[in-house]
């Protein structure tokens, strides 16, 4: 069940991969690359423009303590636990 306070990113429903918790608050988690695909398909952006838009307008935005997380699997390259 989605908490009433959980913020969802409008227009990125196809990129929602789940929910997590930050300080006992439910946070929506989106796949960064799927968000880029949505912008390319839905808005007709080039991939470079979609990445720039994501980085500046979406990932770079703070909309309060329930701000969604955008998981970028590329940041995991070279990391091993």
Regions found by a protein language model. Give the residues of each.
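C-terminal alpha-helical interaction appendages
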Residues: 1-81
């Amino acid at each position: 069940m989605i908490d009433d306070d959980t913020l969802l990113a409008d227009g990125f429903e196809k990129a929602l991969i789940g929910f997590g918790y930050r300080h006992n608050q439910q946070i929506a988690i989106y796949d960064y690359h799927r968000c880029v695909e949505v912008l390319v398909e839905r808005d007709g952006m080039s991939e470079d423009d979609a990445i720039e838009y994501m980085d500046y307008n979406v990932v770079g935005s703070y909309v309060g303590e329930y701000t969604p997380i955008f998981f970028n699997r590329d940041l995991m390259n070279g990391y091993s636990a």
